[in-house]
Amino acid sequence: MLEIIEKENDIEQFFDVLNKRSNMTKNSKFVETVSQICDDVLNNGDDALVNYTKKFDDPNFELKDIEVSKEEIKKAYLSVDKNIIRILEEAYDRIYKFHLTQVRKDYSIKDEYGTIMGVRYTPIESVGVYVPGGKAAYPSTVLMNVVPAKVAGCENITMVTPATKGVLNPIVLACAYIAKVDHVYRIGGAQAIAALAYGTKTIKKVNKIVGPGNIFVALAKREVYGSVGIDSIAGPSEVCMICDETVNPKYAAADLLAQAEHDEMASATCFITSKEKAEEILKYVNEFYNSAARKDILTKSLNNCSKIVVVKDINKAIDYVNRLAPEHLEIDTKDPMDIMAKIKNAGSVFLGTYSAESFGDYMMGPNHVLPTSGTAKYFSALGVDDFIKRSTFQYTTKEGAKALSNDVNDFATLEGLTMHALSAKLRGEE
């Protein structure tokens, strides 16, 4: 189970464990299998999709079952408890309003010759969203991935999600209805990613694929990247906490367990300056564990990938966090804003005693699709920017052309590109 560590050597050994966990997709034994599945879908289209869906999800599956009709989606929405619908719609509204703040505006500048140079933003036309199904059916995944695409203005949003013996989770379909997804297909796994990337007779090729999934989905996204854009290769979920003597140990314990229950490789790490508070947190972790529904998962994730780390001061905790670049970071101290100013690497930051990470997972508004496995050093949370393209433009006047002509002619000649030089020179001679 979860333990407290404070020796430098123990901390470094723990970091080694986390680093090895981060490389799980690189060394996976399933790489060849996923590559074969993707090639099969590329070459055989719908036939391959049907065969794999029969093999993995539903032995009675037929091609006519692949698309979920608008009527079935609406029926699912109407079948869901009204209070659940209220919650889903409230979550949609909050997520939508937050992402509206990310919308970019075109801009331009003009130089002394009247030359105009600028940037324009256009939405990606077609996006595919992967939503896990079966036991790991997460309606929040629909909202968090679809809403920013809607805000960006994507014309076509296609959702794929695997069914269990032909049956889809009605709450997942209700979210698709609320978010106005254009097409829903009951397929999953690497074959679904390949279908979105390459297209089949039934499923149109998309320009970008987003959404989480298991190791097969992650490897498939890596396999098709280049034929299509992707969001990222998601690893196991993780949280780091920075706490001092003011922390509420009950809250901290609950938040560590909330993260650890995601899956067996999930990581929950608390950096804390008080040994006494660390022991209190551990006491509540053990107490709350007894009432958890997912004890098997918790046991493995707490044993393998989680620790309470006692540090000499807050600055040491900050150093460790910046090194790990966690997906989620909770700062539960007397001065959380001051500490956040020193954080360089984190996917999303939750400030203060009352900002539970679970609020962000569902209803707060910012996106819960975040960089994992240390990639917060160079990746960001999913947002509107992930669904738009930035193009530059330039309009040069006759005077502007003359001003640039000689220098560009000489620059191109320097590089040995004589036709570039001619193109510039001709305009300067008018």
Where are these regions (language model features)?
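N-terminal Rossmann-like NAD(P)+-binding subdomain of aldehyde/semialdehyde dehydrogenases
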Residues: 1-125
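Short acidic-hydrophobic, aromatic-tinged amphipathic segments that line or gate anion-handling sites
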Residues: 2-9, 183-188, 308-313
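Conserved small-residue-rich beta-alpha loop and adjacent elements
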Residues: 109-174
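Short internal beta-strands
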Residues: 155-164, 268-275, 281, 352
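Conserved NAD(P)+-binding/catalytic subdomain of aldehyde/semialdehyde dehydrogenases
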Residues: 180-251, 255-258, 262-267
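A glycine- and small/hydrophobic-rich beta-loop-beta segment
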Residues: 262, 270-346
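C-terminal core of ALDH-fold dehydrogenases
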Residues: 323-430
